Amino acid sequence: ESIDEIDPITGDVISEQPIQHITIYPAKHYIADMSTRDQAFAEIKSDLAAQLTKLRLEGKVLEAYRLEQRVNYDIDMIQEIGFVNGIENYSRYFDGRKAGDKPYTLIDHFIENAKTFGDGSFLTVIDESHITVPQIRGMYNGDQARKKTLVDYGFRLPSALDNRPLKFEEFSRLMDTM
């Protein structure tokens, strides 16, 4: 058996030489240690219990049932295989953030790299700013509207609202030079 380099167009083997080194990346780039996972599961279960109580008091029995089934399935999948579709809706628990905290973004990486490899600043260029800047605000508002519906109807825990784009004010505070 071997791993060969293949021409993507013809399907022919490109080289008869054995590959000496190869990097294979995971399909999903999220890893959490066991203590982080255990803490996350405890918080998820606590928030689930609170949300189930709220839904039942509002007479939303179907929504409560739906949410309980969904979250318990998600927890089981994460425990068994380390992943579930929609795991991003639990990102706050695994990141150790509180409800409403700003999510981590690529901009955080830019800031950290600017501090590590430079003077701590970086330039942000926004082309077509008359279109792009309003879209930054719109991304947050649209995301919240969609996810609020999922929460209200028992498809997701309220923590799903914390897996979101930045608010415009958060984005503006992160920009060093724009």
Language-model features and meaning:
Residues 1-177:
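Extended, highly charged clamp/arch subdomains and adjacent linkers
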